Amino acid sequence: MKKLIIIFTLFLSQACNLSTMHKIDTKEDMKILYSEIAELRKKLNLNHLEIDDTLEKVAKEYAIKLGENRTITHTLFGTTPMQRIHKYDQSFNLTREILASGIELNRVVNAWLNSPSHKEALINTDTDKIGGYRLKTTDNIDIFVVLFGKRKYKN
């Protein structure tokens, strides 16, 4: 009986630990990230970026694949950002992609600004759309994928 009580207590404590873990609200997190990027671009007198459903969908798919493969690369399975976007929408003719891993939401924009190629993507003047996704892996690591794009014609 004592063993059963100990096992039950252990199980209950683990269940309590699970319930105190906070799920990531990706939509809310992306609102925060989009807001930070918009604020940065506004301070620099750059054009406003419109949130694009296709770019968000592609970013989400890619973040999940990066998480499953435990890697960060712009060319997983030999695909480019443009190829991934064209799977859903052929009208895009320009894209940029920035990735981050292991950085908290409140530090990711500054981390990108400290990298010349990421900064160039953040403050680009040749795109007008944005879409991104934040993934929390089972190892509790954040993966961010943000795509910038421009269509050659209205979709």
From Swiss-Prot:
CDD domains in the record:
CAP_bacterial
The family database entries (PROSITE patterns) matched by this protein are listed as: PROKAR_LIPOPROTEIN
Species this protein is from: Borreliella burgdorferi (strain ATCC 35210 / DSM 4680 / CIP 102532 / B31)
SCP domain ranges (all copies): 37-140
- Which parts of the chain span the membrane according to its record? none
What protein name is recorded for this chain? Uncharacterized protein BB_0689
Q: Which PANTHER family match?
A: SCP DOMAIN-CONTAINING PROTEIN (PTHR31157:SF1)
**Family annotation (Pfam families):** CAP (PF00188)
